[in-house]
Regions:
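Gly/Ala-rich beta-loop-alpha elbow adjacent to hydrolase catalytic centers
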Residues: 214-223
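Conserved acidic catalytic loop of the alpha/beta-hydrolase fold
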Residues: 191-212
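Short beta-strand element of the alpha/beta-hydrolase
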Residues: 76-85
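Short beta-strand/loop motif that positions the catalytic acidic residue
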Residues: 323-325
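N-terminal cap/lid segment of alpha/beta-hydrolase-fold proteins
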Residues: 34-75
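Short substrate-entry loop that stabilizes the transition state in hydrolases
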Residues: 86-98, 104, 124, 247, ...
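Catalytic active-site module of serine/aspartate enzymes centered on a nucleophile-bearing elbow/loop
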Residues: 361, 365-398
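Conserved alpha/beta-hydrolase
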Residues: 100, 104-126
Length: 398
């Protein structure tokens, strides 16, 4: 894609994002939160997995955990399946570390059924060393640098803009300690993460039927394969700062160089397990990638794309997709590359950079930050436009 075409597509996306923000949802919770949240049904389920008799005690492995809530006043036919990112669990969506309601409650109050996932080998899904292999533990310095206090480290150009963390963002602060207590070890093997959760996520959709996927960070690389495997069951994808950028991860170095590509190549462009491409790859064949000569602007990375002619992603192209990127996160430097990669592969998508719709100062954990409701409102606006129409009833498990 030429530099001129890149600029034109970026302008179109910004105009579309601005239009979405013109008629915002009522994101104030002062009235809603004062009222009890009335549920028609609540419960949990496990999806996927099998009993492994080759291991001592024959454990169940490969399953995810999902808790669901169905509001009494159900207004939308498709539930939202919320999938957390690396080092996290579903608690990312069920409340904030300073005690406010989370995105799960936000969308429940607006008439959506919600399924909140703990990924395979994480949280209530359970972890077995013999089956899943090594894990990477949460790290205090990385948690502060990437999530709670990037402005103190300046590892990427936008980090100094971070203002929305609800607290002092340091050990001993009750809000930070409440957040840090939620951090979990994650499987070290990214391909295993993605394969296990793709299969369990597909099994969840087989149980509950048509649904909206809301992914964040690491689970972005899970959402694409789930949709690729079950394209007829995914009504929309909301990818909140999805795992990226395409082809190569980034090491953040600070000024003046800022960015360095990680040598390892993502085999599907968007992750470490295969996706369905057209024309299909032959046995042993790999995707070929090329990098921009210059970034779209100085504070952004140079994007990788497919070498021409680009293969298409047929199983994703009929699914409405929203990619959201905040102002101060490390993703602010590269989420536009993910949007461009999908576009090149024939997958239409909406890219919203939050400052373009007047929402400033957020980091990567935006669903926990002070203005989390405003961001949920942007998502709600987009869903209203992408999936018009409402339904009076919806079964919790079909």
């Amino acid at each position: 894609m030429s530099t001129t075409e890149n600029r034109r597509m970026k302008l179109i996306r910004r105009l579309a994002a601005a239009c979405l923000a013109l008629v915002p949802w009522n994101t104030s919770r002062h009235a809603d939160a004062a009222e009890p949240l009335v549920l028609a049904k609540t419960g949990y389920l496990f999806a996927g997995g099998k009993i492994d008799t080759s291991l001592p005690s024959s454990p169940m492995i490969g399953q995810l955990y999902a808790e669901f809530q169905i509001p009494q006043k159900l207004l939308h036919p498709y539930p939202i399946v919320m999938i957390h990112g690396g080092s996290q669990t579903g608690t990312n969506f069920t409340g904030t570390p300073d005690g406010r309601e989370g995105w799960a409650q936000f969308f429940l109050r607006r008439g959506y059924a919600v399924y909140v996932v703990d990924q395979v080998a994480r949280g209530r899904a359970g972890y077995w060393t013999q089956s899943y292999g090594p894990v990477t533990p949460p790290d205090l310095d990385r948690t502060l640098q990437r999530f709670a206090a990037p402005e103190r480290y300046d590892l990427w150009p936008q980090a100094h803009l971070h203002t929305q963390w609800p607290g002092a963002a340091k050990p001993g602060d009750p809000v930070f300690d409440a957040f840090y207590a939620t951090q979990f070890p994650s499987l070290t093997n990214f391909a295993a993460q993605q394969e296990l959760n793709r299969d369990a996520g597909a099994a969840l959709l087989d149980k509950i039927g048509l649904a909206i996927l809301l992914t964040h960070s690491q689970s972005g690389a899970i959402g694409w394969p789930i949709a690729d495997k079950r394209p007829n069951l995914v009504k929309a994808i909301v990818a909140v700062e999805p795992s990226g950028p395409p082809a190569h991860d980034i090491d953040f170095k600070g000024a003046p160089d800022w960015f360095a590509d990680v040598a390892k190549t993502k085999i599907s462009g968007l992750g470490d397990i295969p996706l369905t491409y057209d024309p299909p790859l032959k046995d042993g064949e790999q995707l070929s990638f090329v990098r921009q000569d210059k970034p779209d602007q100085p504070d952004l990375v140079r994007c990788w794309s497919q070498a021409a002619p680009a293969r298409q992603l047929p199983n994703l192209k009929n699914i409405p997709i929203l990619i959201i990127s905040s102002e101060a996160s490390y993703h602010a430097s590269y989420d536009h590359c993910t949007a461009a990669y999908l576009t090149q592969a024939g997958v239409a998508n909406t890219f919203i950079h939050l400052p373009d719709v007047g929402i400033h100062g957020n980091g990567h954990m935006m669903m926990l930050e002070k203005d989390s409701d405003a961001i949920a409102g942007v998502i709600g606006n987009w869903l209203d436009k992408a999936l018009p129409g409402k339904a009076a009833s919806h079964s919790a498990q079909r």
